[in-house]
Amino acid sequence: MRLLYLAPMFALVACGGDQLDDGYGYGAPDAGYSSDAGFVGCLSSNECAPGYYCNDFGRCEKQATGSGDGGMPTPPPEKEYEFAPPTSSQRFVYVAMTAQDELARIDGATLAVKSTKVGKSPKVVATIPGTDGAVVLDSFNGTATVVRPVGDTDSTRVLGTLQRLNRLDIDPTGRFAVIWFDLAKAIKEGNTFSVGSFQDVTVVRLAAGNEKAVNLTVGFRPREVQFDAAGNRAYVITQDGVSVIDLGYATDHTATIIPPIAVADPSISPDDLEVDVVSTGEWAAVRQTNSATLRVVNVGSSPGTAYSVTLASPATDIDLAPNGARLYAVQRAAKKLSVVDIPGDAQNPSGVETIDLTNATVGSLTLSLDGKRGLMFTNATSDERVTLIKLDQPGYPQSTWPIKKSVRAVAVSPSGDTALLINAKMAGDPATASTFDDFVDKSYGYTLLDLASGFGKLQITPVDPGAFTYAPDGTKVYVALDGGDAPTATRAIQVLTTQTGVVQTKTLGSPPSSVGILPGAAQAFVNQRHPLGRVSFVDLINDAQRTVTGFDLNSHIVN
């Protein structure tokens, strides 16, 4: 299962390292344990007791018996967390002021605030990559407003869209956007009274002075939108397959229906499929839960042409090389990693390389940004090890290192020399621990892992690590600690220097909700839950902290 760690762009954008709602573990109704205060769910199965797994609702549920080898329960599935790199404006933080029908723009260098009128009750905001502009959706009337800073003012362009859309994806080049309705997001936010189209999307051309919006029909119930690296095509992953939109053509011609390309047998539940489009946009890799067969389907020049690759056991995770030339398939049961060159090895599977991982940690794989390193771990069971595999070297050498706590999720630094491990927490209050190891297991925390030596620095935290982001050069990590809304709750940002491992804890005035980077202003920022609005900025060089409060009321806006 893939879970996306993205900043909550319905509130603030600039933006990076987003997260799921916090509060992990399990409670009495499911696992038979009394829950700790503030510890009422789970995000991975290694936070559950043996014999339980973390279900789709974040609760530990007893596994069925007799379904695995020797009548033992089948090991629970891996959960994949995708940590998106900061999709930041170069200099500004944007905040949707829903009640005022305005978008606030905060200058990370000067803390000056500018408000701009946009559509009705704006919530969804995204920045345009490589620029200081942003796009914001209204919640009622079906409009998107493109906002661009022009000196001390903002230029705006209002475009008509379909109504009640709640997702906004912008291609990596910043030239096009796809706006659509995500039912899963609406359910999560408790907003099912405002349901949008299950088959229509709005495509927006973002060229300054030549903006245009076009409505198109795609496959049933879009689940995700992906783009090729060139930003020429969007791939709408639906229940029926993949609808491929030529973005330039779509915005220059009369709107048409974009039927989906089937990527699996229609009898297979879409919930059992993971579909990833390679960066070239020519092929899609398809993993099916509990199936030892991978499919590689053409979604480019020969749509629908498909090939199958047989694995030693079902893939628990697949990852794509950044250049689109390789697929990596992790096989937990067989303790193997298959290296599939695309499309050659799919067309002739005899070329597939299989790496033996008998002595490694197997389950999930996270790649470095350059694709040269992979970090393997599992969050299905309590395994206190990680394995580094060098994917650019002959024989794929690997190293397995012990760590102090099992792992929930992994993010590799932009520089590729460290990784941040978000550690799993076992049930129970650390204050009741009987041994030091028991105390560590029952505590929240994260680990900075040096990928050259395997040395890990464990940082125990008073609350679950929340949103986080690396500095662009990988020299620092910013981790938010959100203990809730109680006046005495923990509310802080931790600054971790990767060269020394030293952590500074900076107290915040309000609970943090998201963390990101403004590269043009050399600032990290922390958005906070505050009735008037609050954002703190931390200098990337000297760690100086500044805060702006009160931009969510007209009387406090600096115009």
Stretch-by-stretch model annotation:
Residues 12-14:
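C-terminal motif of bacterial Sec signal peptides marking the signal peptidase cleavage site
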Residues 16-24, 50, 55-559:
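Predominantly soluble domains enriched in secretory-pathway, periplasmic, or organellar proteins
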Residues 1, 29-31, 219:
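Accessible peptide chain termini
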Residues 1-9:
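Sec-dependent signal peptide recognition
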Residues 23-44:
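Secreted, propeptide-processed cysteine-rich mini-domains
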Residues 41-53:
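Disulfide-braced loops of extracellular cysteine-rich modules
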